[in-house]
Amino acid sequence: MTAAPDATGTVNTVDAGEVAKFEAMAAEWWDLEGKFKPLHMLNPTRLDYITQQIAAEFGRDLKADAPFAGLHILDIGCGGGLLAEPMARLGADVVGADAAERNIPVAQVHAAQSGLEIDYRHTTAEAMADAGEQFDVVLNMEVVEHVVDPLGYLTACQRLLKPGGLMVCSTLNRNPKSYLMAIIGAEHVMRWLPKGTHEWSKFITPDELFDLIRQAGLDPVDRKGFVFNPLLWTWGISERDMSVNYVTASVKQV
């Protein structure tokens, strides 16, 4: 499906139904035992991948004080700020954007309570790109499977990157295992997420995502799997297993 322009002329890839799902859960973003518990469990692994990619791309020492100082980072689909806050703690100038309006005050209050300055906005990737904004890094985590036009959305993300910029994008693979784990297991058996949080038909295979990223004008440089270990009850990064959750890194040529 291709997104159509809105009244302002901006092409909007936001799916109103998907936004409504997250609006309904907005108050629970920082509840470690709430509906976002799976994301809190995954977050340290996401952060490990993100920080390593940023450090490698921009030559930063993660052991230094404020290693991301001077970097302008956009967390698109920021939710309650689970990624924006760690980026700010590492010294980055962070903008968090979300199409779900109720997420923004939740994120703002938590950042203030944490003593962090983060620019949170109720807006979309397309609107920011049309305004000419650009960033060193765009974090695009668990969003692309919720939009109506993945290519249009990724193209907006490409426009939001400065030349030489980095995009980190994670999503869910589409295969029988991901249906069993992410839909049946997470939503129906474990009840980690409300039923209907994800639509399996919107999941994207790694090869499909790489193709879309290239069509959007970026160069994919890495992809890894996020793998859950039910015995240790922890997540880890896998070089090969991208059968359910996976993450990619892409760069914009100078």
UniProtKB/Swiss-Prot annotation:
Q: Which GO terms describe its molecular function?
A: 2-polyprenyl-6-hydroxyphenol methylase activity; 3-demethylubiquinol 3-O-methyltransferase activity; polyprenyldihydroxybenzoate methyltransferase activity
UniProtKB keywords: Methyltransferase, S-adenosyl-L-methionine, Transferase, Ubiquinone biosynthesis
Q: What domain of life does the UniProt record list for this protein's source? A: Bacteria
What the entry lists under CDD domains is as follows: AdoMet_MTases
Top-level EC class as recorded in UniProt: transferase
Q: In Gene Ontology terms, what is a biological process of this protein?
A: methylation
Query: Has keyword Thylakoid?
Result: no
A Pfam match is: Methyltransf_23
The family note in this entry says: Belongs to the methyltransferase superfamily. UbiG/COQ3 family.
What is the protein name for this chain?
Ubiquinone biosynthesis O-methyltransferase
Q: Which organism is it from?
A: Jannaschia sp. (strain CCS1)
| GN (gene name) | ubiG
